């Protein structure tokens, strides 16, 4: 890592929470004050997806999100590209708040600045491996040259 990139931040996540259910905002304070996920589920009928996630990743760093099945890995990644809206928190990419992006800016961000490979992906069975790999570039209009 060079000296220049040590002072830059690529991805910053601050105080990220996700509560799934019909009225997540009503239960946020209780979760922030220590209500555990079992109590939230059993008494309020809501599911705690993420609790107080904070991280910084500098440009060029490689990080791994690891955990058991159902621990929130995919939920976290889907928040970074805003496929899921958080209940609370901040997500900054290159200093820009992803949560403040309008629809057009968000589409551009998703198609040019971020990517995600889903756990259960589907290849086009009638394409070769190379054609499947080229597909994303082709739909963006990138020439093969």
State where each predicted segment sits.
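Helix-to-loop junction immediately C-terminal to a conserved catalytic motif
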Residues: 81
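Beta-to-alpha transition at the N-cap of a short helix in the ABC ATPase nucleotide-binding domain
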Residues: 119, 123, 128-130
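ABC-family P-loop ATPase nucleotide-binding domain
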Residues: 1-46
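Conserved ABC transporter NBD signature motif
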Residues: 89-97
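Short helical segment in ABC ATPase nucleotide-binding domains corresponding to the A-loop/adjacent helical element
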Residues: 130-138
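The feature captures the beta-strand-to-loop junction immediately N-terminal to the Walker
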Residues: 66-68
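ABC ATPase NBD coupling module
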Residues: 40-44, 99-115, 139, 144
């Amino acid at each position: 890592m060079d000296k220049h990139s040590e002072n830059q931040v690529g991805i910053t996540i601050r105080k990220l929470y996700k509560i799934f259910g019909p009225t997540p905002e009503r239960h946020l304070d209780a979760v922030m004050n220590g209500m555990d996920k079992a109590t939230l589920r059993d008494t309020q009928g809501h599911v705690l997806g993420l609790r107080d996630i904070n991280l910084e990743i500098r440009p060029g760093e490689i990080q791994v999100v690891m955990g058991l099945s159902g621990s929130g890995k995919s939920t976290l990644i889907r928040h970074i590209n805003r496929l899921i809206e958080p209940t609370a928190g901040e997500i900054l990419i290159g200093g820009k708040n992803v949560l403040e992006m309008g629809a057009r800016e968000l589409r551009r961000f998703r198609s040019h600045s971020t990517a995600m490979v889903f756990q259960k992906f589907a290849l086009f069975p009638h394409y070769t491996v190379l054609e499947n790999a080229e597909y994303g570039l082709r739909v963006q209009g990138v020439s093969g040259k």
